[in-house]
């Protein structure tokens, strides 16, 4: 059924919940996992930040992304699965575009990612990478919502 499962990871608790669900799917289907972290350099790439200052910030973002991927891979290995990892950089400002692109290049048949469930003005101001992936993807997308404060951990 799902043989190639792309998991978008960002280091958040919601992302970890998404990874846990992806592991369950992979175990039940015999699927393989690709962990993807997107470094969005547009966050700080402006005309107001001189290169001398931005270069160390970009490097810190890359290092943080590599750590996030390594931690996620450790979770996968503890579940007796293997995975591939990919750190992707974008200047487009659209993380969703990169996630969908990576899914296409790897020929994923499922994308799994966490969603923070923003509503109202926060959603309008910040947008939603998860919603954009859902709109752009030609393969099924499994969105895992953040755990509400009153909900017990599974």
Identify the role of each PLM range.
Residues 3-52, 75, 79-86:
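Small/aliphatic-rich secondary-structure junction motif
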Residues 38-67, 150-154:
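Acidic, proline/glycine-rich short linear motifs
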Residues 51-54, 102-104, 129-130:
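Short, hinge-like loop/turn segments at secondary-structure boundaries
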Residues 74-111, 151-154:
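Structural beta-alpha unit
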Residues 110-132, 150-153:
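Glycine-rich, Arg-bearing micro-motifs that act as flexible, cationic patches
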Residues 129, 137-138:
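Short, structured coil segments at secondary-structure junctions
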Residues 141-151:
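Short, flexible loop segments at boundaries between secondary-structure elements
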